[in-house]
């Protein structure tokens, strides 16, 4: 009985910490606005790229975004409901048949383009 109370308590805390985020899935191009504290300054950094994977559920859910900068692939993993994420915008929707797009890492930048939904 006490475990049931504990589970309900965990679920209520999880529901309280969830943020409203737009629907997106692997293959979509998203723009993530991240709050950064640099000493006494606060600024917002934009990271735009292709969503490679999305995993977890509720508060522990994360997603990985990949972009090419100066010929080098950069991947960052963000918690979906993190307070440092100011905003997540979906730039375009992609058409893919996989849930995890790890194969994109081995493709050239031209070959890694994803078809867009119209």
From Swiss-Prot:
**Per its UniProt entry, which superkingdom is the organism in?**
Bacteria
**Keywords attached to this entry:** Ribonucleoprotein, Ribosomal protein
| GO MF, one annotated term | structural constituent of ribosome
An annotated GO cellular component of this protein is: cytosolic large ribosomal subunit
Presence of the UniProt keyword Ribosomal protein in the record: yes
Q: Name one GO biological process term.
A: translation
- Check the record and name the InterPro entries matching this protein: Ribosomal_bL19, Ribosomal_bL19_sf, Translation_prot_SH3-like_sf
Q: What does this protein do?
A: This protein is located at the 30S-50S ribosomal subunit interface and may play a role in the structure and function of the aminoacyl-tRNA binding site.
Q: Which family does it belong to?
A: Belongs to the bacterial ribosomal protein bL19 family.
PANTHER family linked: LARGE RIBOSOMAL SUBUNIT PROTEIN BL19M, RIBOSOMAL PROTEIN L19
Q: Which HAMAP family match?
A: Ribosomal_bL19
Q: What is this protein called?
A: Large ribosomal subunit protein bL19
**In the record, what lineage is assigned to the organism producing the protein?**
Bacteria, Bacillati, Mycoplasmatota, Mollicutes, Acholeplasmatales
Its encoding gene is what?
A: rplS
């Amino acid at each position: 009985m006490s475990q049931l109370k504990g589970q309900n308590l965990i679920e209520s805390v999880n529901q309280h910490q969830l943020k409203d985020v737009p629907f997106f899935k692997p293959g979509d191009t998203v723009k993530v606005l991240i709050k950064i504290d640099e000493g006494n300054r606060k600024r917002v950094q934009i990271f735009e790229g292709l969503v490679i994977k999305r995993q977890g559920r509720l508060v522990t859910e994360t997603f990985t975004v990949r972009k090419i900068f100066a010929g080098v692939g950069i991947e960052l993993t963000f918690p979906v409901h993190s307070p440092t994420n100011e905003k997540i915008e979906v730039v375009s929707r992609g058409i893919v048949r996989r849930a995890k797009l790890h194969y994109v890492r081995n493709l050239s930048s031209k070959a890694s383009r994803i078809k867009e939904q119209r």
